[in-house]
């Protein structure tokens, strides 16, 4: 009986993320929140170098704090990790005038948190729902805390985005989507992917894709 109880407690501990100061104890391993912040910022900066974003463009973030901890997506949301990632990205994007949209989980139909002014300017469909740890996730809660007037919208057409933990952001990035490679492949224990976009190339045999109208 004692052996069973020991194994049960050990399993519970191994699935737990405890925040002590700036250190996350994840499954018995230490992970500095500053390390998560640094990796996130490095990844974002490398993406921005290739994404050619302009002022007032929208950038989508999909993230799983569970996956960052090495756990199954949606099972172990952690608000401290969520705040670290969202605040890092939001602060950087503000510097260049780009708007952040934070995607929620499937339980909210992958709705997104944006500033109300962004929703109104882009004629986005606002929906009535509030995120929680188990429906929307830690990233959306962090966005609600960070934004001035946060709202949830059903759909956006972002120019670029970052996906931390294989949350699938493609439905919210404009055509044509282009995968971007950076030196950062993981944040914590989560797989990271990136998308930018370009206008479609249209036309047939006579179409040109550079300005040369008389030839």
Predicted regions and their residues:
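Generic secondary-structure signature for well-ordered alpha-helical cores
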Residues: 45, 49-52, 90-98, 144-152, ...
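Short, Lys/Arg-enriched N-terminal segments with co-localized hydrophobic residues
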Residues: 1-30
């Amino acid at each position: 009986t004692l052996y069973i109880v020991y194994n049960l407690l050990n399993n519970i501990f191994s699935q737990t993320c405890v925040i002590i100061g700036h250190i996350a104890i994840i499954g018995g391993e230490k992970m500095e929140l500053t390390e998560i912040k640094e990796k996130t910022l490095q990844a974002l900066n490398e993406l921005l170098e290739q994404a050619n974003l302009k002022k007032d463009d929208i950038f989508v973030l999909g993230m799983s704090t569970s996956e960052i901890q090495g756990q199954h997506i949606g099972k172990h949301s952690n608000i401290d990790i969520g705040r670290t990632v969202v605040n890092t990205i939001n602060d950087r994007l503000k510097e260049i005038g780009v708007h952040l949209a934070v995607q929620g989980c499937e339980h909210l139909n992958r709705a997104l948190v944006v500033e109300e002014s962004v929703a109104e300017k882009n004629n986005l469909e606002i929906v009535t729902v509030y995120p929680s740890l188990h429906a929307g996730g830690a990233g959306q809660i962090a966005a609600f805390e960070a934004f001035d007037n946060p709202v949830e919208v059903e759909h956006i057409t972002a120019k670029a985005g970052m996906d931390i933990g294989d949350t699938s952001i493609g439905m919210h990035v404009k055509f044509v989507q282009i995968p971007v490679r950076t030196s950062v492949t993981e944040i914590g224990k989560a797989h990271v992917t990136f998308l930018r976009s370009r206008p479609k190339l249209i036309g047939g045999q006579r179409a040109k894709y550079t300005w040369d109208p008389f030839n």
